[in-house]
Amino acid sequence: PDFFNSDQISRFLKGYDFVDNDSIPQDTNGHGTQVTGIIAADGQLIGIAPKVEIFSYRVSSDGESVPSDLIIKAINRAVEDRVDIINISLGVNMTHAKIDNAVNNAIDHGIVVVAAAGNSGPDKSTIGSPARNPNAITVGATYNNRDSSMVSTLQVGETQFQVLPMLGTNIISDPISTDIIFGKYSRENDFDDLDVRGKIVLAERGGETPDEIVFFSDKEIFASKNGAKGLVVYNNQPGIFFGELIHEYVSEDYYPSIPTVSMTREEGLELKKILESETSATLNVFNHPDFIATFSARGPVSPFYQKPDLVAPGVFVNTTSLKNFYNITSGTSYAAPHVSGAIALLLEKNPELTPHEIKSILITTSDVITDQYKKEFEFDAGGAGRIDLKKAFNSELIFDPPKLIFNLSGQEISERQVIKMNAFGDSINIQKVEFSGEDNVEFDYEVKDSSLYITSKLIENKSGVFESRAFITYNDITYQVPIIVRVTEATIVILEKENELSFQVKRPIDWEYAKITVTNSETYEEQTLSITPTKFESLKLYEAGRYWIETNIKNNEETFDVYDVYDIKTDAKEKKPIVSSTELPERALIILIIIFSIVIVVGFKFRRKNY
């Protein structure tokens, strides 16, 4: 943190500077101070947990990159210092086993580890280590309840499009329902022979040639001068963009007259084709605080567990800055400390809670969130939902595990799993259990003592990944357990004899080859083998624990993926053979932010375009 910031200095206890190798980890970049303020500010701004003690560990000299060995040293030092919470975010779209092992070691020592998901969204599979660690609490970012939480919708006929309001666009009192018409590039001469009065204009970004610059503000001016009610600008290159109407090249007296939004090139071309037969459209711009930030990194990270775990406010967050100033900033970096502060309050109430119990409470008490069309966000984007601190604080039930993944097929149409429930020593009287989700899967349940047994059954043999939730009511509090159901066309059977696994492929019947990867879920050590209809291999597992089984089955030109988990109950009688390995040199990691509660921060910059 910034030792000159009066809102924070009283909260700093100790730490270490791994860059200069001294005991004064002064923040020179500003992000550590911003993150610390969200957790523990105690002045003009009040943090989530203003009375916590802050440990700070500096690992970056320039705020741009950090050697992974310093990250590991900082985590290990935090373990030595016996902190309660470590909050880290690393912007690496990769798995880093040594960092993950350091995180696991911290959790084994009873420390809760919170990881920001990263700022590489909205693309899928953009969460890296340590946020992809299954044991960490991974946090994505939502808007907040400020006026800046603006979203937009565009529906043409029955088709809903993803559109983003441009900077400078204002909320409208009522949706605009009218015809939509293609207006080329929305330049002045594009409206010479085009009547757009009372209509929404669809226009392409830029101009007819690559070097022609047409500001978004000019597109808005010409569309509104010709009587348009709204403007939709689609990209002239793949993907989405964040446009701004207010910029340095616009006149001081300019004020946008009509709502203006952006969309991807792909959807823009699709809409342009739709306009050949359907022109009835509705455009709306409104506040939606629980909308997931576009930059928030997404899963999936693994077929065996789901990330992120939950989301928290991370857009336009007002917090402390260097030299006793304040700053509004955005990033999953600033969503994570909201969760860290909440955890501090939970531990203050009940210091005996374990990291896994804390994680369960936060997941199962999260609020389900929806997009601008009132559709639930996918788990890969929003996890279980937005943190609900009040509900978490009043929670009286812990679920283990707090999420379920079922693997079904046309041959294995049902599966039963168990959730252990803990009511802090009280007897458990479940009032109600309900399920939401897909029509092709049905659920049933049974409560026995402190166990909740959930059975999923395939109704329609449709391959894919389907999302559901179980809603469990206890003592008038309704908890939720996210459920993923994966349906495949293939089936394997796992056989065990004295810690040795063998595999049989049941479907497809005419399979030719199967590659099987077995991963220790704690150490991430992988072993592989291959089998054919005439060649069988087995695999010895020496350590007790849960193993992830991934099977890739080839049949002619098709490939089928099958996933399962298997629990080895005891260690093998014989010792595991020692295999030598060559250590590879560590390379510096590019970081979007790393914050601890313990705090080191490097931020992310998010640029808008004005043409």
Predicted regions and their residues:
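Subtilisin-like peptidase catalytic core
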Residues: 16-94, 140-145, 180-191, 195, ...
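Hydrolase catalytic cores
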Residues: 36-39, 55-61, 126-129, 210-212, ...
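Structured lumen-facing ectodomains of secretory-pathway proteins
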Residues: 126-308, 312, 322
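Short, solvent-exposed loop/turn segments enriched in Ser/Thr/Gly
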Residues: 411-418, 459-469, 499
